[in-house]
């Protein structure tokens, strides 16, 4: 069978723009940026890694624009970062609940963040929680005790925790996202469903070893074009980990869906891996 457009597909990282200029998506990172190129020349802080950042243009209805891109590439559902002040995202979830669902970006430096997760969950029905440990100021390592109330709330509400791991693309310190730190978190919170984001490089072999060790540890392919999927991850999916690896894109932050799906068909997944990777694993984990 291999890759084909008829496989149910869930994109675990897709953005809905609200205007053509998306530079305000990255203001949270400004206190960490020190080199002039990152501060003043890039459209986004990891632009040196992404040659063709999508230009979305201006649209009267960005939700319809996002749906059009999804339909073009046969994406059935997409997970979008939720912001309570965003009318666009609230309307997307309200008007198209069969197409969009949400993760809530969190920061343990924010007072009462765990209580806020519960409030947003009860009011808006988020499906997951997400974080960028190296991108927050001050940075907070994955295994720092500051995360414990958030991890506990994720367990209480049965919400998966999606976390950037490995060397971050922006020129900021990597220490908070070392893959080895996940070991302590999964040990201390065995019921926490932890999903790695953004590569886990250069520690992909360790990421696979930890996924074998912990039943609730997963990996999503966000921010990587398919031709650059780590070999360790592809091999793991084809052997002992087909229920652990899930598709996530990076549109429009750094990759176009045209590029992703043009390259996707060349990923050497086994036939029985494709449905799991593209949608079935996400449906099961997130109860879609």
Predicted regions span which residues?
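Mid-to-C-terminal alpha-helical segments outside catalytic/metal-binding sites
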Residues: 1-12, 19-68, 72, 77, ...
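Hydrophobic/aromatic residues located in beta-strands of well-ordered beta-sheets
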Residues: 9, 78, 100-102, 161, ...
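Active-site environment of divalent metal-dependent phosphoester hydrolases
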Residues: 17-19, 85-88, 109-112, 136-137, ...
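Short, acidic/polar
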Residues: 59-68, 110-121, 204
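A structural motif corresponding to the C-terminal end of an alpha-helix
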Residues: 68-76, 96, 156-157, 188-192
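Active-site gating/metal-coordination segments in enzymes
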Residues: 76-77, 83-169, 176
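Catalytic pocket-lining loop regions of alpha/beta-barrel enzymes
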Residues: 127-128, 141-246
């Amino acid at each position: 069978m291999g890759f084909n457009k008829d496989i149910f597909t869930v994109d675990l990282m897709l953005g809905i723009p609200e205007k053509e200029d998306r530079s305000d998506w990255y203001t949270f990172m400004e206190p960490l940026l020190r080199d002039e190129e990152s501060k003043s020349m890039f459209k986004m802080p990891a632009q040196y890694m992404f040659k063709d950042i999508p230009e979305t243009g201006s649209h009267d209805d960005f939700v319809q624009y996002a749906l059009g891109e999804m339909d073009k590439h046969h994406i059935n559902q997409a997970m979008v970062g939720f912001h309570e002040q965003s009318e666009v995202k609230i309307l997307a979830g309200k008007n198209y609940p069969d197409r969009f669902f949400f993760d809530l970006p969190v920061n343990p430096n924010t007072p009462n963040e765990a209580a806020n997760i519960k409030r947003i969950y009860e009011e808006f029905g988020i499906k997951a929680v997400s974080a960028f440990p190296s991108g927050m100021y001050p940075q907070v390592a994955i295994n720092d005790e500051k995360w414990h109330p958030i991890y506990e709330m994720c367990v209480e509400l049965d919400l998966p925790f999606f976390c950037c791991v490995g060397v971050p693309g922006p020129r900021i310190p990597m220490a908070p996202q070392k893959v080895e730190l996940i070991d302590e978190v999964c040990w201390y919170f065995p019921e926490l469903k932890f999903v790695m984001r953004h590569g886990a490089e250069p520690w992909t072999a360790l990421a696979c070893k930890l996924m074998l060790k912990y039943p609730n540890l997963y990996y999503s392919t966000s921010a990587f074009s398919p031709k650059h999927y780590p070999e360790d991850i592809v091999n793991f999916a084809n052997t002992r980990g087909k229920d652990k690896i899930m598709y996530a894109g990076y549109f429009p932050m750094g990759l176009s869906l045209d590029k992703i799906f043009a390259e996707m068909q060349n990923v050497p997944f086994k036939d029985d891996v494709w449905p799991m990777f593209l949608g079935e694993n996400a449906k099961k984990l997130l109860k879609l």
